[in-house]
């Protein structure tokens, strides 16, 4: 059975039912460039950042919609005011024909309308323009402010104190050692050129004098012997007879220990007992006394 040219034309002799079946034993070979697919999935999972131009356009569109609603509201007030004025004029004409004096309620309505400013289309446009400027200022403030920094003006002095290290400490008696508000303010002329330079030179001179005095005291106290000799005498690993450190030996072996001390003792040879100098022979001169050179 073949469908659209796919499959066997007849199932006779094929050992199958003639339908195209899926081979479950087939192992699908995937492409080696699997990293590309993973990169695509990672990009799809990334959070999309909003375009600032689109967000600004959306804010301006909301501002224009608010302005349209505000203009419609003002125009409705103007139309209602005109209708009330027309009704009041008609009532005045009717009352003027019948009664010479209108009632008190109509007089109060006329006074309240005279107090309220009559709006025209030009006045409406002026009010709409003012409202637009106000909304644009609010939009600029929203751009300048950041989230989580509303109390920055309050926390800024505290951070400044922490960076400078002006922390209040309590004594045993409970008194404050350091307080920023109780510190004596520095004079205005403290950083003037002559006074500040003189004070700086005086402090540097004091520092040099103290250093020289301590140095002199140190060398006067140890002037009887050398500094290196004093270090060697205090160190146990050095001896006065030899400047080399002592040799480590096996303390469990008696023979090696005694041989080590025996080597250190002076021998009875004449070269060690007497301070005889080695005779220097001049090879250029003739031999004297039958010396064999």
UniProtKB/Swiss-Prot annotation:
* Coiled-coil residue windows: none
Q: Where is this region: Disordered?
A: 30-52, 80-119, 146-293
Q: Which InterPro entries match?
A: CWC21 (IPR051372), mRNA_splic_Cwf21_dom (IPR013170)
Mention one GO biological process in which this protein takes part, according to its record: mRNA cis splicing, via spliceosome
Domain CWF21: residue ranges: 55-98
Residues where Phosphoserine occurs? Answer: 118, 285-286
Location (main, coarse): cytoplasm
Q: Which Pfam families match?
A: cwf21
Q: Where is the composition biased (Basic and acidic residues)?
A: 43-52, 106-119, 159-186, 195-214, 227-259
Q: Where is the composition biased (Polar residues)?
A: 80-97
Q: Which UniProt keywords apply?
A: Cytoplasm, mRNA processing, mRNA splicing, Nucleus, Phosphoprotein, Spliceosome
Q: Name one GO cellular component term.
A: Prp19 complex
- Localization of this protein: Cytoplasm; Nucleus
Protein task: Involved in pre-mRNA splicing. May function at or prior to the first catalytic step of splicing at the catalytic center of the spliceosome. May do so by stabilizing the catalytic center or the position of the RNA substrate.
Q: Which family does it belong to?
A: Belongs to the CWC21 family.
Q: Which PANTHER family match?
A: SERINE/ARGININE REPETITIVE MATRIX 2, SERINE_ARGININE REPETITIVE MATRIX 2
| Oligomeric form and interacting partners | Belongs to the 40S cdc5-associated complex (or cwf complex), a spliceosome sub-complex reminiscent of a late-stage spliceosome composed of the U2, U5 and U6 snRNAs and at least brr2, cdc5, cwf2/prp3, cwf3/syf1, cwf4/syf3, cwf5/ecm2, spp42/cwf6, cwf7/spf27, cwf8, cwf9, cwf10, cwf11, cwf12, prp45/cwf13, cwf14, cwf15, cwf16, cwf17, cwf18, cwf19, cwf20, cwf21, cwf22, cwf23, cwf24, cwf25, cwf26, cyp7/cwf27, cwf28, cwf29/ist3, lea1, msl1, prp5/cwf1, prp10, prp12/sap130, prp17, prp22, sap61, sap62, sap114, sap145, slu7, smb1, smd1, smd3, smf1, smg1 and syf2.
| Name of the protein | Pre-mRNA-splicing factor cwf21
Gene label: cwf21
């Amino acid at each position: 059975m073949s469908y659209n040219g796919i499959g066997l034309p007849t199932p006779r002799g094929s050992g199958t039912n003639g339908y195209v079946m899926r081979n479950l034993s087939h192992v699908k070979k995937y492409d080696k460039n699997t990293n590309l697919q993973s990169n695509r999935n990672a990009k799809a999972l990334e959070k999309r950042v909003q375009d600032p131009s689109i967000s600004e356009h959306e804010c301006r569109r909301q501002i224009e919609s608010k302005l349209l609603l505000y203009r419609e509201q003002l125009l409705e007030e103007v139309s209602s005011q005109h209708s009330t004025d027309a009704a009041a004029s008609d009532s005045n004409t009717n009352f003027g024909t019948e009664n010479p004096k209108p009632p008190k309620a109509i007089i109060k309505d006329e006074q309240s309308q005279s107090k309220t400013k009559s709006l025209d289309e030009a006045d409406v446009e002026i009010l709409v323009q003012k409202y637009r400027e106000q909304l644009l200022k609010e939009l600029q403030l929203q751009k300048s402010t950041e989230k989580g920094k509303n109390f920055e003006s309050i926390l800024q002095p505290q951070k400044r104190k922490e960076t400078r290290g002006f922390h209040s400490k309590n004594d045993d008696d409970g008194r404050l050692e350091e307080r920023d508000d109780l510190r004596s303010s520095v004079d205005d002329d403290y950083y003037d050129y002559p006074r500040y330079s003189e004070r700086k030179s005086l402090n540097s001179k004091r520092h040099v004098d103290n250093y020289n005095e301590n140095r002199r005291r140190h060398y006067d106290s140890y002037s009887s012997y050398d500094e290196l000799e004093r270090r060697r005498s205090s160190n146990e690993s050095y001896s006065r007879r030899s400047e080399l450190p002592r040799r480590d030996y096996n303390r469990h072996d008696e023979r090696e220990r005694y041989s080590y001390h025996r080597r250190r003792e002076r021998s009875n040879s004449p070269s060690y007992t007497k301070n005889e100098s080695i005779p220097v022979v001049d090879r250029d001169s003739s031999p004297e006394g039958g010396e064999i050179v």
